[in-house]
């Protein structure tokens, strides 16, 4: 099993690479790519950790050597948020980066499962899909927007509020991956209930958690460590499913049947070919249903922006 991390010299990429070096199954290969010349050195640094995961780093304009034979590609390349920016302000820079990297994936490892971490995810996933489609290699069961950070944040905040162990809580999060498009299904957590005010306040905190980190870092960056953890969780789940483990379920932002929007985050059963089944989002509370209806225009506009970036 070979996993490639693109953007591996950045804050998320280095944290992700460290976690994967420690947690990938024995015998796996990990390849790190970034435009920054430090990248082969990051790989050497990590290679001193005594786990049975082979690691190699590549830098420069060409990601091809890192991508050859990859089963899973995780893309965290791009610029980070600064105070006063929202995820869509990143669009102008990050759209071009994702387009370029996905073009290289289409040529070098078209059958790989691809997880997009680069924000704004609502839009960058649409860009990736259109690039793969143009190259004639798009498989909607193998392209994912990684929204796992919304899930782990929800688990943490719910556990804090309700005095539970964070490991005991698993909150499904649907929709998209920015602002109002993030919708935690708080009504679906077994054995936990919320007043309407609690649900509204908690939902808002989960939606704004990225901004909370950006402001707390006082201009020094955005959520890199928790995002690295989230991306590792998703990547490792994908690897386990690709290796034949049954019953692996994660929420991610994928192209589905278009019931809500062309791309939509929902619980997915993962398997040997990526998405095995898009699971139902179940019954929503009145608050959740209202939030879902209210966000769809925003989500659809984000998606359109990505489609237009490639097709116009």
Curated annotation (Swiss-Prot):
Gene3D superfamilies: Lactate dehydrogenase/glycoside hydrolase, family 4, C-terminal (3.90.110.10), NAD(P)-binding Rossmann-like Domain (3.40.50.720). GO terms for molecular function: L-malate dehydrogenase (NAD+) activity. InterPro entries: L-lactate/malate_DH, Lactate/malate_DH_C, Lactate/malate_DH_N, Lactate_DH/Glyco_Ohase_4_C, Malate_DH_AS, Malate_DH_type1, Malate_DH_type1_bac, NAD(P)-bd_dom_sf. The keyword NAD applies. The active site is at residue 177. Pfam families: Ldh_1_C, Ldh_1_N. It catalyses: (S)-malate + NAD(+) = oxaloacetate + NADH + H(+). GO terms for biological process: malate metabolic process; tricarboxylic acid cycle. NAD(+) binds at residues 7-13, 34, 94, 117-119, 227. GO terms for cellular component: cytoplasm. Keywords: NAD, Oxidoreductase, Tricarboxylic acid cycle. It comes from the Bacteria. PANTHER family: MALATE AND LACTATE DEHYDROGENASE, MALATE DEHYDROGENASE, MITOCHONDRIAL. Homodimer. Catalyzes the reversible oxidation of malate to oxaloacetate. HAMAP family: Malate_dehydrog_1. NCBIfam families: MDH_euk_gproteo. Belongs to the LDH/MDH superfamily. MDH type 1 family. This is Malate dehydrogenase. It comes from Salmonella dublin (strain CT_02021853). The gene is mdh.
